[in-house]
Regions:
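Amphipathic alpha-helical segments at domain termini/boundaries
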Residues: 6-122, 139-155, 223-246, 324-334, ...
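Rossmann-like NAD(P)-binding element
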Residues: 31, 80-82, 195-196, 210-272, ...
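NAD(P)+-binding Rossmann beta1-loop-alpha1 motif at the extreme N-terminus of oxidoreductases
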Residues: 147-210, 230, 314
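Rossmann-fold dinucleotide-binding core
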Residues: 1-7, 17-25, 274-348
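Generic beta-strand/beta-sheet core signal
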Residues: 26, 167-169, 175, 190-193, ...
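Rossmann-like dinucleotide-binding cores of NAD(P)H-dependent redox enzymes
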Residues: 186-224, 309-322, 344-348
């Protein structure tokens, strides 16, 4: 048993999987084994040595580490838990962490059988709630349909880009550059100055460093990812790019300007994508040539954590452009919605 504070804030609401050594360090497992056979041997030995084993809470005089909500020490810090949880979630209305906290606080004030009923009640609320249904639909049924190509127009072969131009190295552009490089694409990260573009690349460097530290990637893989991102302030470096993803300020004039400059040097059939979240795709495309190649590609922030991309089709977006965007590596692994915007409408409408 870890105690309420440690269990809730450091384990239960984190939603993370732990490597065996870390799990042992935290205290959520008791022993490690190198092989399955060794694990069985240790389990048999423990059972033989403890024929009358009981759960910790069944032992005479057992007390929860750190106390219960009624103990003065825990009671003095318990009111801060909801605020800390909200800060951790960045205000997102996620019901599971809330129910976990409620279960821990309520169940530690009653007998164990009542505690199990409290846990079952909160779990049932989550499993049958609308949020669970929405996530099941989006991440299972919708994702299966997307990966099966049901959202891709008929008559178009699968396509994958080789070199990506990301216009704008701010928070969104930096994140987009990272996920594109993670997908294996060569990325040219363009901003108004080389300093700004290099600053955008440091975002990827930070993510790689965290990944290596946490064992989610290797140093070699991280370095290879970073080598795929080239920061620049020169439009000429976009030569050879077969997809453009714009992530500059929300200004129709500015967005059209950077597209015009990029279109002078990228591949003549390059897919033109805007990450806008507020401006109508049809209006943005209206000031450009090749409106059929123009499409909305709205990533959600933070890009490296949000498994969602919204594809927005303009009035003149061609089936070929939609098919390209629907078959790219990042698109195929990310659930997203597809819609059409009319002149004067918003992608969010």
């Amino acid at each position: 048993m870890l105690g309420i504070a440690n269990a809730v804030m450091n384990v239960l609401v984190q939603g993370r999987r732990h490597k065996p050594a870390k799990a042992l360090e935290i205290g959520i497992i008791d022993e490690l084994a190198a092989t399955g056979e060794e694990m069985l041997d240790k389990a048999r030995a423990w059972i033989a040595a403890n024929p009358e084993a009981k759960q910790p809470w069944e032992q005479p005089g057992y007390k929860i580490p750190g106390g219960t909500p009624s103990s003065p020490k825990l009671a003095s810090i318990l009111p801060a838990f909801p605020a800390n949880l909200r800060k951790q979630l960045k205000g997102a209305p996620m019901p599971a962490p809330r129910n976990i906290l409620a279960t821990a606080v309520e169940s530690t004030q009653v007998d164990v059988d009542t505690a199990f009923r409290i846990e079952a009640r909160y779990f049932t609320e989550l499993a049958t709630g609308q949020t669970s249904k929405n996530m099941t639909k989006a991440f299972f049924y919708d994702l299966q349909a997307i990966n099966g190509g049901k959202s891709r127009p008929d008559g178009h072969e699968k396509w994958a880009p080789t070199k990506v131009a990301v216009l704008g190295a701010g928070m969104m552009g930096a994140g987009i550059a990272y996920v594109c490089a993670l997908a294996g694409w060569e990325v040219v990260l363009k901003d108004v100055s080389l300093e700004a573009a290099e600053k955008g690349k440091t975002y990827s460097e930070g993510l790689v460093a965290k990944g290596v530290k946490r064992g989610k990637t290797t140093l070699a893989k991280g370095e290879a990812l970073l080598q795929r991102i080239t920061p620049t302030a020169d439009y000429n470096d976009l030569a050879g790019c077969d997809i453009v993803i714009e992530a500059v300020f929300e200004s129709v004039q500015l967005k059209q300007e950077v597209f015009r400059e990029a279109m002078k040097v990228v591949e003549p059939d390059a897919l033109l994508c805007s990450n806008t979240s507020t401006l109508p795709i049809t209006e943005l495309a209206a000031g450009l040539d090749r409106q059929g190649d123009f499409i909305g590609l709205h990533f959600f922030s933070p890009v490296d954590k949000m498994p969602l991309v919204e594809i927005i089709r303009g009035e003149r977006t061609s089936d070929a452009a939609l098919a390209k965007r629907s078959t790219s590596p990042s698109g195929s692994r990310r659930p997203r919605s597809s819609s059409t915007t009319a002149a004067g409408s918003s992608p969010a409408a």
